[in-house]
């Protein structure tokens, strides 16, 4: 008797393994791993937006592990050494906002806080208008203005319920703002 769960897992694995490095004509295990982590962390549509075009993986000279993902010459992701997940760069945030409808991965802030957050300052709960209900504590998020323009990237320090209920406290620890990339 066949196990349908195993058959399903094998089909998904075969789809993932179809990633081929066209220049070499062979499998690129690092690229497969990089895409798999992005799909797990951000979801399939967002990962596809991040990995479109020509991909260059920057690896550590010492360990050989993936450190940065460059897509069409733009730095879109950096991999954290501690847990093997990605930190999102502003170019990556722009690609996700273009490809995936709101509210996916987004925290929307009031106009009053846009100048501060875009400079790299943290986003506080009292200035948040809305957020993705699927955000988990410490997830990578995109901070946007009310017109869905990305202004910063960072990590969620509160869950959606807390963000909407609290009058004080840091909602997003901002890593980089829009003005950092200009």
Q: Which positions does each model-derived feature cover?
A:
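Helix-rich terminal scaffold detector
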Residues: 1-26
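Low-complexity, intrinsically disordered regions enriched in charged/polar residues
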Residues: 3-10, 31, 90, 111
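Beta-strand/loop-dominated core regions that host nucleotide or nucleotide-derived cofactor-binding catalytic loops
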Residues: 14, 23, 36-55, 71-130, ...
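Charged, low-complexity, helix-prone segments enriched in Lys/Glu/Asp/Gln
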Residues: 30-36
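Substrate/ligand-engaging "lid" and interaction regions
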Residues: 56-61
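Terminal interaction modules at protein C-ends
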Residues: 65-66
